[in-house]
């Protein structure tokens, strides 16, 4: 994408349901940027970066499977996020995928998801999120911006199974 002028305020688009994106909005508001939460994929064309946030599970049909443990699927949101991702990729707009957003990116590039991990691998609890460490891969673009080891919250019962084409793992837990 072309260089942004000094007078231009960076615009970040969060493609998600406003009722479920408050934590993401609060985090990104710490940046000198305009934050727009929307369900309109076309908003992406005028932004500087697309954020695909966490949420429920991806509809398994999108990666060629029947439901074998996926919960809280939102097929309408999945479709909108895939459309926004297509627009961003075509326009050369950077994309950040967080939790489910990362899985959306993986599926869009032909990857698959483990729909329900074994209990000994879970990053969730009936009483709420679990906190655990993640490790940034040292040859990733983000390595220079973030600590190697980060503590994150999660409520995962899914994970990437087969990595999508042309994708690279940059953080592991």
Q: Which sequence ranges carry the predicted segments?
A:
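Conserved SAM-binding loop
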Residues: 101
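Short catalytic/ligand-gating loop segments at beta-alpha or beta-beta junctions
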Residues: 151-157
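N-terminal beta1-alpha1 cap of cysteine-dependent amidohydrolase-like domains
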Residues: 1-98, 106-107, 111-114, 118-146, ...
């Amino acid at each position: 994408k072309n260089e942004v002028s000094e007078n231009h305020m960076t615009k970040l688009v969060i493609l998600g349901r406003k009722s479920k994106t408050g934590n993401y909005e609060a985090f990104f508001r710490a940046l000198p940027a305009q934050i727009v939460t929307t369900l309109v994929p076309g908003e992406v064309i005028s932004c500087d970066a697309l954020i695909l946030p966490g949420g429920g599970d991806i509809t398994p049909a999108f990666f060629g499977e029947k439901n074998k443990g996926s919960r809280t699927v939102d097929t309408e949101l999945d479709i909108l996020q895939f459309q926004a991702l297509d627009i961003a990729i075509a326009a050369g707009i950077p994309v950040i995928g967080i939790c489910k957003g990362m899985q959306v990116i993986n599926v869009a590039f032909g990857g698959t998801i483990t729909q329900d991990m074994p209990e000994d691998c879970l990053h969730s609890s009936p009483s709420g999120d679990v906190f655990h460490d993640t490790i940034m891969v040292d040859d990733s673009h983000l390595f220079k911006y973030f600590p190697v080891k980060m503590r994150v919250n999660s409520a995962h019962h899914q994970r990437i199974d087969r990595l999508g084409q042309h994708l690279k793992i940059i953080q592991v837990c």
